[in-house]
Amino acid sequence: MVLLLRYRSLTINLTPLIPKSQKFHTLQSFRNPNFISIPKISASTNNPTTTTNRSISDATKFAKSVLFIPPGVEIEELTDDMVLPGSNIVIGPFAGHSQIKEVEFVKSSARARDCPKDDRPEIAILGRSNVGKSSLINCLVRKKEVALTSKKPGKTQLINHFLVNKSWYIVDLPGYGFAKVSDAAKTDWSAFTKGYFLNRDSLVCVLLLIDASVPPQKIDLDCANWLGRNNVPMTFVFTKCDKMKATKGKRPDENIKAFQQIIRENFKVHPPWILTSSVSGLGRDELLLHMSQLRNYWDQ
């Protein structure tokens, strides 16, 4: 199952994680982030009732299968400018102040029970080693060394809490899939990270980072499936989207389409997703706005 939004302890919008035979067309263009066109709901002068009903039906089907629609948004009221560029995310009434004015490192924890005990909302960042977690955090807060970046996979092996605007946390989780560690270390990572997901009541959402410069990786899909089955809300964040040309294999836009196709075949409702680049800043403001509406909905 996949939980798209979390409202304190209330679980909503649950969707069975089962294959589905019906395929939906993905309306996207990597080079033009304003890629989603909402079907227009307009009446015909000849037969207004029939045309309007058909248009509403088409729009509803499209929206439910492709877009992430937050609470407070009616499908019939959707317009193009409500969809964040480079994403499938609709902005609703819970979106608010999103800019980061101050950030401070709070602590590193080796176990979930050692994490901060206050009730501030948390948005966790997770991904394969060297997917760009630390770079994304530094991009979001616009400071170069808030999160330690390294070319050595598996550098971050603790749960790191950063307090933002004295009101919410960014949580930098250890990367998964690194090869140059012992099997015991991998087991420990799995145990304490999963413990964090399952027992952290203040967790609003997980940003699951996907490297757009490589084809879909089984370990990313396994992680997404595990999060879905355990009702952990997630947003797919495609990283390294500035690398428009492929040096080896397929282009990033082709890799993204391939990943989305697999997700559509396994999730009845597509989770929210967004394109980003820590180099160019692509998607930064849009992702922060999305994060704000998730936090505000959780905190109401």
UniProtKB/Swiss-Prot annotation:
Pfam families: MMR_HSR1. Keywords: GTP-binding, Magnesium, Metal-binding, Nucleotide-binding. Mg(2+) binds at residues 134, 156. Its cofactor is Mg(2+). GO terms for molecular function: GTP binding; metal ion binding. Signal peptide: none annotated. It comes from the Eukaryota. Residues 119-297 form the EngB-type G domain. This is GTP-binding protein At2g22870. HAMAP family: GTPase_EngB. It comes from Arabidopsis thaliana (Mouse-ear cress). Belongs to the TRAFAC class TrmE-Era-EngA-EngB-Septin-like GTPase superfamily. EngB GTPase family. GTP binds at residues 127-134, 154-158, 172-175, 239-242, 276-278.
